[in-house]
Amino acid sequence: MSSSLKDKRSVLRKTIHRLRTHYNCAVAEVDDHDVWQSAILAVVTVAANRAQVDSLLAKVMHDLETASDFQVVEQELEYL
């Protein structure tokens, strides 16, 4: 857990880099930029079919949920 914006940004930088490196997805912090207690991340991917998207996002969520440096409180999926 972070106790300052500097700590939060360090954790996010490492997490975003890990997700981008291990999975074929784009990741960005989309809200709560200046709130050290929380972060809102968006993970985006494109695939030939929905099953591939579901599989990748399930792996990403598992990665995030098993991380020890933060806690996933809520998730939301949107398909376009």
Please place each PLM-identified region on the residue numbering.
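Short, charge-patterned binding micro-sites
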Residues: 28-49
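Surface-exposed beta-strand edges and their flanking turn/coil or helix-capping segments
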Residues: 7, 40-42, 56-58
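Broad gene-expression machinery/nucleic-acid interaction feature
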Residues: 22, 40, 74
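N-terminal first-folded block
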Residues: 1-21, 26, 63, 67
